[in-house]
C-alpha cells in the first residue's frame, strides 16, 4: 500500500499510497511533475483498516542492509549499489544468478569500486560503469 515514504528534518512524513501495483508509481515517475488520468484501481481507505509497521529484518533481507550501508556512507556508494543491483536483477531474471547470490555480488561490488566522498557528475558516470562491469564480471 505504501510505495514510498520520506521523513523530513522537522519530523513531518509524506507518503505515496496506492493499490499494491507498481504501474501508478512508475507512471508518475515518467510523467512528473504532471499527473495523468489512469484507469488503475483506486485505494479505498475504508478497506485499509489495519496498516502495520515492523522493524525491517536486515539479517533476513541482506540487500536492505546493504542499501542502508550505502545510504549512511553516502558519496557514490548508493550509485554503486544501484548499478550492481540492476545487473544482478537482470541476471537473476535470465536464471544467471541465484536469488541469494545477488547479495554477494552487490556486497563485493561495493568493496571493489573506489569510494568517492563528494562525487561530481563525471564521478557518478564512471562509478555506474565500473560497478556494472564489476558486477557482471563477478556473475560470470
Label each PLM-derived region with a short phrase.
Residues 1-140:
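Catalytic, metal-anchored helix/loop core of enzyme active sites in primary metabolism
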Amino acid at each position: 500500500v505504501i510505495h514510498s515514504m520520506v521523513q523530513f528534518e522537522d519530523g513531518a512524513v509524506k507518503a505515496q499510497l496506492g493499490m499494491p501495483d507498481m504501474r501508478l508509481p512508475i507512471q508518475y515517475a515518467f510523467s512528473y511533475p504532471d499527473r495523468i488520468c489512469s484507469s488503475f484501481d483506486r485505494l479505498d481507505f475504508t478497506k485499509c483498516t489495519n496498516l502495520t509497521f515492523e522493524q525491517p529484518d536486515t539479517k533476513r533481507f541482506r540487500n536492505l542492509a546493504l542499501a542502508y550501508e550505502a545510504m549512511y556512507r553516502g558519496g557514490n556508494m548508493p550509485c554503486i549499489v544501484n548499478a550492481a543491483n540492476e545487473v544482478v536483477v537482470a541476471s537473476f531474471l535470465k536464471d544467471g544468478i541465484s536469488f541469494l547470490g545477488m547479495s554477494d555480488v552487490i556486497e563485493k561490488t561495493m568493496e571493489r569500486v573506489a569510494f568517492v566522498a563528494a562525487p561530481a557528475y563525471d564521478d557518478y558516470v564512471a562509478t555506474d560503469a565500473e560497478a556494472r562491469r564489476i558486477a557482471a564480471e563477478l556473475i560470470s
